[in-house]
Regions:
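Conserved single-residue anchors adjacent to enzymatic active/cofactor-binding motifs
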Residues: 1-187
Length: 187
């Protein structure tokens, strides 16, 4: 059940593999895009959003070959009207859930890469670091062994808030969807 009208639109548009391929080809940095075989992208049925957060988020999971290895592209849609400091923590939780599922399938296998992507449509421009480690108190002064204890990952953020300046590009269906979520942030 989709709790928010934006969820249905998100899942219909980006749930269509051709639109997801177009989004990745249009928005990912070229050095990342060249590692992904977009022709191998397949939608997965899983969602990892907790029930109490479904009002604020929707997600899609895709399987793809990245550097000739099975991997995932995880897209999180952020419905909140403001930047959320905890998105990195939530992504880490969802990525762990994806890896847990993989471990249950085959225990001794190495875990697949997960490429985390956040689409933001809030009222204000995104103002939170996309580096997970920046969420840790005192990280900027840590060195050596302490710094090694911090999980390090970065998510790709696409800010479609009304004042972000993010250019809307791509095929018609994708542009229409992105313009619509941008306009929804104005209300």
């Amino acid at each position: 059940r989709l709790n928010n009208p934006h969820d249905r639109f998100f899942k219909e548009v980006l749930g269509d593999v051709a639109n997801t391929q177009a989004f990745l080809e249009t928005y990912l940095p070229p050095d990342v895009l060249q590692t992904i075989d977009v022709g191998t992208i397949q939608a997965e049925k899983d969602s990892f959003i907790e029930q109490d957060l479904k009002e604020f988020y929707a997600d899609l999971l895709f399987r793809a070959n990245i550097r000739n290895r099975e991997a995932y592209v995880y897209i999180l849609l952020e419905h909140k009207s403001y930047s959320d400091d905890n998105v990195g923590v939530q992504l880490l939780r969802y990525m762990s859930a994806i890896w847990d599922k993989e471990i249950k399938k085959q225990k001794n296998r190495r875990l697949p890469l997960i490429l985390p992507i956040v689409l933001y449509q809030g009222k204000e421009k995104w103002g939170v670091s996309t580096q997970f480690a920046d969420r840790i108190e005192g990280v900027e002064t840590m060195e050596g062994a302490l710094k090694k204890a911090i999980p390090h990952f970065e998510y790709y953020l696409y800010d479609f808030s009304s004042n972000s300046g993010e250019e809307i590009k791509g095929p018609d269906d994708l542009r229409l969807y992105l313009e619509t979520i941008r306009m929804a942030s104005i209300k």
